[in-house]
Amino acid sequence: MPRMRFLEVAGIVLGVLVLACVAGWGYWFYTPSIKPVPALDGELLDGSVTVDGIERNFRWYRPAKVAPSPPLVFVLHGSMGDGREARRMTYYEFDRLAERHGFLAVYPDGYEQHWNDCRAHAPYEANKKNIDDVGFVGKMIDFFVSQEHANPERVYATGISNGGQLAYRLALELPDRVAAVAPVAASLPDEANFDCKKSGKPVAILILNGTEDPMNPYEGGEVALYGLFGSRGKVISTDATVSYFAGLAGHHGPPRIVRYPDVATHDHSRAELQIWSDGPGPEVVLLKVEGGGHTFPHPFHRFPRFIGATNADLDAAAEIWRFFTDKRLGSPGT
């Protein structure tokens, strides 16, 4: 082959390879930009409390029309995030919900962008230094009850991934102050990886997990991206996690099943609710996303594809608030 012809062919092949790499990166890693929340009438405010000599920061959305003795919803970010990222990764939906329903949406910052959850083998500083994140949440509750007249019987917490793991810790260690939790893309650590104190008290809980999560394995196992990167130790299966909380609440019968219409066929996933409420304790719910990944479902936004499918049949924030709305400390079934 003449030299010029060879160079032409090589250039074409190289160009095709570059385009293929760019296309592949775009498909797996690109996330459509999430538009900033539309102008709402409320305020986004900043605050801080001191825990063990460390200043801990948070921000909160106060709607224009705050409900009398408003509920309090903590939205907990994932690893390498902060309160700003928690707002963005939940698509600003909790701000919108706060505006409609009058609750206070709170977005705290973890210690060095992580939470000290129940996983003993988590490698980040919040865990290594045993940062008191349960105490942090407790002090924030005190702040909002005192300064914003929040209802201490209607305190809720949700979070994704590392934030979901902290929600579990609150359920286990702070059930007398948190009326309900909703962990997303998270399961309880296994016995060898467990570093929390179990109160043994039931708590209302909604668990939202995807069956094809490449980081938090639905059937249990090592928490790492595709089982290879960034290990946080092992977790038990989603079903075992649900069974633990259902057992605490005294639910022993089969769950009631509610399937969501599969309106978004392009997302390669389907969702259903499994509801346990036959016993004397609080409601326990699994929102199972068949084919779902390490993501936060929404009809119009999605996470990068490399962490799995984002279900578009439902709005996760709205479902979580719907679960929270009738839960109160000390009331029957909660």
Language-model-detected regions and their locations in the chain:
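A domain-start/cap signature at the N-terminus of enzymes
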Residues: 5-72, 90, 96-100, 129, ...
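Conserved beta-strand scaffold positions in the cores of enzyme catalytic domains, especially
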Residues: 46, 105-107, 286-288
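Serine-hydrolase catalytic machinery in alpha/beta-hydrolase-like enzymes
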Residues: 49-156, 165-173, 219, 296-307
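The conserved beta1-alpha1 loop
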Residues: 74-78, 185, 209-210, 290
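Acidic beta-to-alpha connecting loop that harbors the catalytic carboxylate
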Residues: 110, 211-214, 291-293
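A short acidic, glycine-rich active-site loop
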Residues: 125-131, 227-236, 307-311
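The feature captures the conserved acid-bearing segment of alpha/beta-hydrolase catalytic domains
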Residues: 179-266, 275-279
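C-terminal catalytic histidine-bearing segment of alpha/beta-hydrolase fold enzymes
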Residues: 205-208, 236, 246-334
